[in-house]
Amino acid sequence: MPFLNPLRPIPLLLLASLMVLAPQPSAAASGVGYGASMPANSTPASSVQTDSGQANSASPNSVRQLYRQRRWSDVVAAVPLPARGQPIPPADLLLLRSFALAQLSRLADSAQTLRIAARAYPRDARFPTELAGVLYRQKHYAEAARLLRRALRLSPRDDYARNFLGTVDFLQGNLDAALADWNPIARPVLDDQQIVPAPSLPPLLLDRIFPFSPGSVYTLRQYRVTQAQLALQPLFAAVSDELQPQPDGHFRLIVHTIPHPGWRTAPVANLLSTLRSLPYQAVDPEFWNLRHSAVSLVTYLRWDAQKRMITAQLGSPIRSPDQRLHLDLDARNENWNLTRTLTANASIVPVATLQPALLNQERIRAGIGLDELFGSRLLWQTSVGFSRRRFRSLLGVPAASPYFDNTSAVGLRSSLRAVLVDSPIHRFDLASTLAVQAHHYFTRPLNRSVRLSAALDAHWLPASSGDRYRLHTLLRAGDTFGQIPFDQLWMLGFDRDNSLWMRGHNGLINGRKGNAPLGARYLLANTDFDHLLWRDPFVSVRFGPFVDTGRIYASDEGSASGTSGPLFGAPRWLTDTGLQARLHLFTSSTLVLGWGHDLRSGSNTFYSAISH
């Protein structure tokens, strides 16, 4: 194996100890047998000429002999660092000096020697590798990893450096990067796999999600596919992988799972999860793994007098963990106050003559959908459904507008999500989503309509290990073609039923929807930067600033009440900023608390939401 090669003047015993996660000094830090591993063709001092034509005073053979005799101080004295303008000693002598300094526990001086040598011999991969060993001993893992990547750029086939790099990433908790580093050298090899606790799921489904054969290499692709399948199939509340090193250099894979709380297994946790939306006059009854068949039923019931809602989804894997079939139901009865939304454009209604604009909307939609994974990078989702909407109690609203026609429709929804960039080394990923919704209405003049939307979703963890800091940016755009009913308009603002958040714009007014800008097309950018403040087994707290900016454009459809021009939209760009806290609870729920400030109007909004 590479790290047992006696001809390698690099930290020979470090990787053997790292593979069992018992960190030991590198050769640079421990001085392990370097004299025996010096290249046999080292140039004698008498034949090594410096740029000034002067020969070095110490020969490699004599310094090697001092090193074999463990005379560390004499080695250091025999190879002094040159003063400015003096010639640099040969590379082999600088390596011996750094090893001897490490044996004297002078790690800082050893690192200084290696840095000088790396500048003098920039194409010699041994120096960044040895310096990484010293920095590893000093627990500077991030810089050690950076140096090892530099060494691999100089010597791409250096299996030892690649093994070392994978180990450093593994010790930092960056399993993705460790697998990316190890896989080219056929590591890590799995001897065993355990799922703890053992789930009561169909065995065939488990075997397909967690494939295993003794002696196989655990690949990054396998890990990513499993993560994508678990995101598609809500089989567990949480899952984490643990690689346990074995004495023979192989690994055991432990898959730690947290099951969804059940009424029999965890009645208290299940009750808390069901009541998590109680502050919003709602409950979340959820039933997981029905009859141990991986079938789930997720429902949401809200009895708020201004916005009643019932949603339900019955889902199950089909044929393989890459496919999920689901039946959906969404029924709503909502009171809307459009007073400010309709008058956003002063050319329609003068602001000084505001009149209440109220309506009640009833809508029900039922459909069936199929979600399918292609590897770990592509997710295709499609569904067909039937919907019916009815508008009542219109006050101050142009009732003759097609927006408010009572109508039924059949619709097709389809989306494709693709991972464009996935860099475990830089801890950055970028995904794109394209979605289309097409509807055929049975009431004229609506006829047909199409809604298109696109998104770019970027995540970055700036630190080399952990998730203490996190940056998330989401860019979205949408457009509408054809005449649409009111419920198909986009909305920019904070509303727990809305995904297009502008957190400085409250979507409610006196509990009724309609306070946020509406329109037929939009652009939106959301950026969040948060910091992990606290984490324990029961709760984790993240806090940080955010910036939302966007524009929503009016529809071309005017009212039929004597006015001309669009009914909805915002005349200017909107920009909000603020602070947000996220509390992830042991019930697998996340509570969001925030303050948003509208930079244009100066208004403030306090908001909260909870998700599972």
Across the structure, where does each feature detected by a protein language model lie?
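Gram-negative/organellar outer-membrane beta-barrel architecture
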Residues: 227, 232-431, 494-510, 515-525, ...
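C-terminal outer-membrane beta-barrel translocator/porin domains of Gram-negative envelope proteins
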Residues: 409-541, 545-549, 553-555, 560-563, ...
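Bacterial N-terminal signal peptides
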Residues: 10-22
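Alpha-helical segment of the N-proximal tetratricopeptide repeat
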Residues: 58-85, 96-105
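C-terminal beta-signal and terminal closure region of outer-membrane beta-barrel proteins
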Residues: 558-612
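Signal peptide processing junction and immediate N-terminal pro/mature segment
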Residues: 22-40
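Periplasmic polypeptide-binding modules associated with outer-membrane biogenesis and secretion
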Residues: 102-103, 110, 115-121, 126, ...
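Alpha-solenoid helical repeat scaffolds
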Residues: 60-61, 91-96, 126-130, 160-164
